[in-house]
Amino acid sequence: MAIKKTLKWGLIGLVVAGVAMLAVRSYNSLGGPVLQPWHTFVPVELRAQELDGADWARYMAQEEAIFKSVRAEVSQKLEPDARVPINRYFEASPVYPARFKQDWNRSYIMEPEGKPVGAVLLLHGLTDSPYSLRHIAKLYRERGFVVIGMRMPGHGTVPAGLTDVRWEDWMAATRLGVREARRRVPAPAPLHLVGFSNGGALAMKYSLDVIEDPLLPRADRLVLFTPMIGITRFARFAGLAGLPAVLPPFASAAWLSVTPEFNPFKYNSFPVNGARQSYRLTDALQGQIDRLARSSRLGTLPPVLTFQSVIDFTVSTPAILTALYQRLPDNGSEIVLFDVNRTVKFEPLLRPAAYVALDQLAPKTPQPYRFTSIVNASEDSHATLERSIAPGQLQAKDRALTLPYPPGIFSLSHLAIPIPMDDSLYGMQPDMKAPPEFGYHLGAMDARGERGALIVDQDFLTRLSSNPFFPYLLERVDEGIVRPSGPTGRNVTAVATPGIPVRLEAILSTFVPDDIRPFAGP
């Protein structure tokens, strides 16, 4: 009887808390920013079933129609107060994408000089566009690969595109991209998948799908940048936040953030459905990894090379190891982690966890993958080392790098990994003598002043958007193109390090005191 009474009151408490949360969410949405045409106009994308029956020409035709519809329904219908230079949808704006030599919001194909030696499919991240992997595309083209940079459904157009998309649409688009890659460069020429953030989850899931459906073309190598294997914060509950939006007065409740759109190749605003679909994708991915691991069917996975910051606000770094790498076979896989900058004297301001994150992630028992970290040579030196633990070993080997950790940068970020420091748009050190290639040097803005004066959160200016170690990253990706890695031959098997399962970790992380705001996008 006492147990029933406790359960009854517990259930009542949950219902009351849920109603209170929805009431607060509804009230806040009434006072939020007014939704603009780019928040309300939803372009017509091909859905999963249509994508599975389409070819590249069909996808390109639909993409062209989508961009024409955005111009007609958004850019050409702007109210006078939206016709400002900082609005990417204003045709006279310096950040209007269609005015550039190439609109990197669109899918593209790069052909190498001479006969192709392989093909690579590039999969960008959530709220992102094919722009983010264009420097990786250049490397692959120089190495003789046909490069397919694919725009995922709901991306590159208007943020409202993410209000109606499903993760199954992204997976179907990935399959379409692989089909086109193999049409242009048939097997046995190598096929690589490169994924950034949400694109990393898509690349990984595609490779798992191949195990269960041998008719799908197999990738020979995966390169992942900050892959979305597990999501931090409240993403798993994001759908609840959007419930008030079923009533028109609370339409803005369908959005986790509504921000001016000044970034030509990435959305600033983020709808609830974007977080919801990313969570559904990672949940399906983790479940599939668990299922295939239990049946010992992961042995045919291709080598996976991952680059990740130990500090990441968007994805769970521990989940990459516990949910993925500790399940991988001995196949030449490697993870590269970028440590915090220990010479920056921010210790009183940085969370204590930042200084111990790398030690907690390092293997405690021999593993079948290579564990590499980029660290300061010492705590008072900007010089850096590559510290690598080989598969089946625990002893690390150091290699000095010629890339110092820049003063003033205390860590890398989720966004920064695949972007060089001299990138014209996002780079911290672009060529300031040349006119901006894409309207502004967003990554080089170093603004200080009074709070409340800017139209955006200071995160937009202080969050690092380029990687000081990009030359190293490019070198390592190139190594895998020229000299592909493979098994050690030592029959190394994964040994799970002590810790809680990734799904339980995700649930518990929701109640951490500093975890007090919803997942607001990458």
What is the role of each PLM region?
Residues 2-92, 384-522:
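N-terminal targeting or regulatory segments adjacent to alpha/beta-hydrolase or S9 domains
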Residues 21, 109-113, 266-453, 467-489:
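Serine-hydrolase catalytic core
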Residues 98-156, 486:
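Short, surface-exposed "cap/lid" segments of acyl-processing enzymes
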Residues 122, 153-168, 240-244:
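Cap/lid segment of the alpha/beta-hydrolase catalytic domain
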Residues 158-190:
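Catalytic nucleophile-loop/oxyanion-hole region of alpha/beta-hydrolase
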Residues 193-195, 225, 307:
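Short beta-strand immediately N-terminal to the catalytic nucleophile in serine-hydrolase-like folds
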Residues 194-199, 203:
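Gly/Ala-rich beta-loop-alpha elbow adjacent to hydrolase catalytic centers
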Residues 222-234, 340:
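Active-site nucleophile loop of the alpha/beta-hydrolase fold
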